[in-house]
């Protein structure tokens, strides 16, 4: 029997060489080669086989922002961020509010706080996170958004 206060830790490779989705080779490239212009740090990791990708941190451009994501995961991450950001942005102390919101989400998902980054979530965890965020919004008097992420399915799902 597991201890109730033990939280799951997500082991994320922030310098990927193998794709977490298809096992293909990952390259570290300047992102203008994909997007036509440079964004953020100017760098990204991209799978040569399935084209999954992830951006990198601006101050640490070799460090990935999370796991490689296909178009389904990219859409789900965007929807989760849009929904959760409304819970803390514009608050008097945004940093404290953001920390509290993500601590709440981590608890609901059974994750340790350090693992609670939307960029670290696979599609299954993104679906769970979206449901939890909708509950959090409702509890705070904000409207629920459509079940968007929960309905995102890959062809093989």
List the model feature ranges, each with a label.
Residues 1-61:
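N-terminal cysteine/histidine-rich coordination modules
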Residues 5, 9, 40, 66, ...:
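Short, charged/polar micro-motifs that form catalytic or ligand-binding hotspots
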Residues 60-95, 99:
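Extended interfacial segments that mediate partner engagement and assembly in macromolecular machines
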Residues 90, 108, 136-139:
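Surface-exposed polar/charged interaction patches
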Residues 93, 114, 139-142:
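Intrinsically disordered or highly flexible coil/loop and linker segments, enriched in small
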Residues 96-121:
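Short, surface-exposed acidic
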Residues 115-135:
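Chromatin/DNA-recognition segments of nuclear transcriptional regulators
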Residues 131-157:
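Long C-terminal interaction/binding lobes of large macromolecular proteins
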């Amino acid at each position: 029997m597991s201890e109730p206060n033990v939280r799951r830790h997500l082991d994320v490779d922030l310098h990927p060489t193998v794709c977490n989705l298809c096992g293909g080779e990952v390259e570290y490239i300047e992102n203008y080669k994909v997007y036509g212009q440079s964004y953020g740090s100017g760098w990204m990791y991209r799978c040569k086989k399935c084209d999954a990708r992830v951006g990198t941190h601006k101050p640490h451009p070799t460090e990935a922002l999370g796991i490689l994501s296909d178009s389904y995961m990219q859409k789900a991450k965007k929807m989760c961020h849009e929904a959760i950001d409304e819970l803390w942005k514009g608050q008097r102390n945004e940093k404290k509010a953001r920390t509290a919101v993500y601590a709440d989400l981590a608890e609901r998902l059974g994750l340790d706080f350090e693992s609670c980054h939307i960029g670290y979530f696979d599609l299954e965890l993104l679906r769970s996170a979206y449901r939890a965020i909708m509950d959090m919004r409702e509890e705070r008097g904000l409207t629920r958004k459509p079940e968007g992420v929960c309905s995102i399915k890959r062809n093989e799902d």
